[in-house]
Amino acid sequence: KIYRFFNHPTKLILGFFVVTMCVGAAIFWKSRCISWEETVILQENKKEPVKDTSIVYISNCFVGSDMTAHAFDSLVEKVNEKKPDVILFGGNLFGRHTNEVTIDKTLASIKKMKAALGIYMVEGSADSALVEEKKEKISGAGVHLLLDESAVLHNGLQLVGCRADGKTKKPMSYTLSLINKEKPSIVLAGEAMEEKLKEEKKISLVLYPKKITDTGNGGTSGVNQMFPRNVLASAKINFMQIKK
């Protein structure tokens, strides 16, 4: 009977279709689940090291497009369970055409976030215009915008935000010039950065709104890409801990 089933073209095609649908559904379900990664950053050759600091990094949520405001509210609860010292939004929190109601709901959820050293954000390529337009409202939710700016936390950790886009975007070289090389630093980068520049500025960690890796020939390539949209990255959170 098994032989007859697989020997029948129509049934074989149907079986392949069912298996493909099941695999696709499993991948989609997994992509919507929030996953955590832990990274340890060693503060080498720093005259002013910081104490252990827990950081939650969130990017590519595309609220109003890939993620609903309700789903984001659930994400906030999971973040608060981690009890982070700092929360970083690395870009593309909103979609390109997120409406006002969804923006307000999202910001109301952000107000419930708890981070002793604050919440910081840089916009991504998708929401650069929206963030620039709504920056006062976003700041009112307790978010510190790093639009080609730097900030030094109370524990000495530097945060630098390099914008992805926007009419008033400054060159990355200018923003990186704000870094104090004696302090550990995390750069939220909206565009790819050469490895030699990272070494020159003694940057501890560079975070991108999409995972970008060096191809070895001076270029970059995206990883964890899913067709037609990078759904996996939209629900991705990286948990990092700074250590001496």
Give the location of each predicted region.
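Short, well-ordered secondary-structure micro-motifs
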Residues: 2-9, 68, 99-101, 132-134, ...
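Conserved catalytic scaffold of divalent metal-dependent phosphoesterases
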Residues: 44-48, 61-65, 95, 125-207, ...
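Conserved beta-sheet core of the metallophosphoesterase superfamily
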Residues: 193-244
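Generic detection of short hydrophobic beta-strand segments and adjacent strand-loop junctions
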Residues: 39-41, 151-153, 235, 240
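Acidic, histidine-bearing metal-coordination/catalytic regions of metal-dependent phosphoesterases
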Residues: 1-54
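Membrane-embedded segments
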Residues: 46-144
